[in-house]
């Protein structure tokens, strides 16, 4: 299982999706890092990046919310990335932690311009940044985009646990991670239940970084797995009779929040102050939050 140290390290990096396309969160920002890019696509509401002349900043304030509609912005983001590619420059997709919003646009771009399936596009971005996890609403929009581009889909949203909706490609990763965390006896018990969401791949797992395994394990601890004959309707989990008095229902599997309560708290100090000891105005850019930005 990926250690917290590795997760924290990845959050503080600008991940290279392609030589001309990077995904990052605020924790990775510094003057030195930003000097490498010709365009920064800022997806954070209330955040303004005043950059030097060589860098173009595109502000697209979008909430990391399942109801946020990204479709009006696909073309604009594609355009900026393509201009950077054709000009031998680098484009940076920036959101608070580089997990949901920026990753979603990166996946959409790969799917659109490299003619890949959604599954393969997700894996391509995940390979570069293991901690990505678009929220369910964003993933559904990616599915809709794939349907529009290819006339068919390679991923779907499933409900493997009561009240828990998740993309099947992510659930497969979660299932494998959950199996790894179980004892041998629990694995045999789980194997006896023909779960339709069981993983059959050895893909890299991204949910290690989001603590979803622990949430699922706690949910499974309150339920027992049932055998079902071949051909019977799928039965995933039912309340355990031994704990029926204390169990009110399944513990919903919650996706980790990708936005900190105060986004400014994860900004590196080096990005907020001019370290120059001279009296000259050498500061060429600054990071700031504006309450009037929505």
UniProtKB/Swiss-Prot annotation:
Cross-referenced Pfam families: DSPc
Keyword annotations from UniProtKB, A to Z: Hydrolase, Protein phosphatase
InterPro entries in UniProt: Dual-sp_phosphatase_cat-dom, Dual_spec_Phospatases, Prot-tyrosine_phosphatase-like, Tyr_Pase_dom, TYR_PHOSPHATASE_DUAL_dom
Keyword Hydrolase (UniProt): yes
Disordered as annotated region, ranges: 234-294
Keyword Lyase: no
Tyrosine-protein phosphatase domain: residues covered: 13-151
Active site: 95
Cross-referenced SMART domains: DSPc
Gene Ontology terms for molecular function: phosphoprotein phosphatase activity
Family: Belongs to the protein-tyrosine phosphatase family. Non-receptor class dual specificity subfamily.
Protein name (Swiss-Prot/TrEMBL): Uncharacterized protein ZK757.2
Source organism per UniProt: Caenorhabditis elegans
